[in-house]
Amino acid sequence: MIYVISITVFASIIFILVGLLLLVEAKVVKKDDCVIVVNDDEGKGLKIQGGTTLLSALSENKIFLPAACGGGGSCGTCKCVVEEGGRGLLPTELAHLTRREKKRNVRLACQLKVKEDLKIRLPEEIFNVKKYNAIVVSNENVATFIKDLILKLDPGAKLEFKAGAFIQIDVPEYELSFSEFRCRVAERFRPEWDAFNLWGLHSLTEEPIFRAYSLANPPSEKSILHFTVRIATPPPGVSEAPPGVGSSYIFNLKPGDRVTLSGPYGEFFVKETDKEMCFVGGGAGMAPLRSHILHQLNTLKTKRKISFWYGARSKKELFFEEEFKGLEKEFENFEFHVALSHPKPEDDWKGMTGFIHQCLQDNCLSKHDDPTEIEYYLCGPPMMIDAIDDMLDSLGVEPKMIAYDKF
């Protein structure tokens, strides 16, 4: 009897708490129309239903803020200034805002629920961001977990962007099993998929989302868009973790499929100076670095000294190698270097071995007249970026000389 009474009391408390939460939401979250005034344009206030996020409200009105994480609050890119309304900062925003930004009332649009009328300020370049429709031209494996995705925009459409920019690909509701990838993963890469037992994984999203991907093509290619996308699989030994929703969707795309995207966005741009440039990358971080290098050499015909240092695990994980070797032969101011951290016996590798940051230091920077005068552009896995950053810091390179994009 005591057990039954305890359960009843506990359940009653839970129901009361849920009821209170619903009551608070009903009182606090404004469900009526709210008006968002952008950049003091009172005549074009946006009427939206209260309760949605500012990011979603703007997107519904064809104003597309960058949100590399898809609106989850982890990237901190969907910033805007809230001049009126919005109430206080949320704990989820604090880590992404500097002290100066907090004083200026900068907010993360993905975290701010619209509960009242707002006045906000956005950068003018945001209004150049547009939606595009495209068709998949090809989607081939170039490494074990990386696809080389090529899209063609609909006739007449052109994407004006700067090298280093990214776009956001819309991901619709879907559900799929990784067993469907068997016919889409190149045969030479399947042993690794077998070893990690990936065919049994499952991916789904019950609502439309979007994910950010860097462009791998130079700005001169305005209607054919190129991406290198790594599928996000669970860490070894954590099979219960879900695979990446966006990358799983992209991995499953096939020629003829339709894709919707928005852009361009980005801040990972080359500085307009005469300084030497050093590009360092790994994995899918190839994308923006390829865009930069092709633009600098083929379009701008720059005379600046450029080197590209790319790290991979084994020879099977190298791609676009012949393209960069060709550029090295064509342009005397360009050097291409590759290092393998774990070459296989069958690779018969005669090149550099080890992690790319150490190879860069041992084979270049330790012999350079002044490494602090080089501009560094880094793109790849966070651990790689952190290792390079620490190494450059030990050499006295100032943060202003380093730009990076963590994948």
Give the role of each language-model region:
Residues 2-71, 82-103, 303-407:
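Reductase modules of NAD(P)H-dependent flavoproteins
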Residues 20-27, 95-152, 157, 177:
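Fe-S ferredoxin-like electron-transfer domains
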Residues 164, 285, 381:
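Short, conserved phosphate/pyrophosphate- and ester-handling motifs at nucleotide-, phospho-/glycolipid
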Residues 66-76, 109-113:
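Cysteine-centered iron-sulfur cluster-binding motifs in ferredoxin-type domains/subunits
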Residues 133-255, 339-342:
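Ferredoxin-reductase
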Residues 249, 262-275:
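A short, basic/flexible loop-to-alpha-helix module at the beginning of a structural domain
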Residues 53, 60, 77, 119, ...:
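Residue-level marker of beta-strand positions
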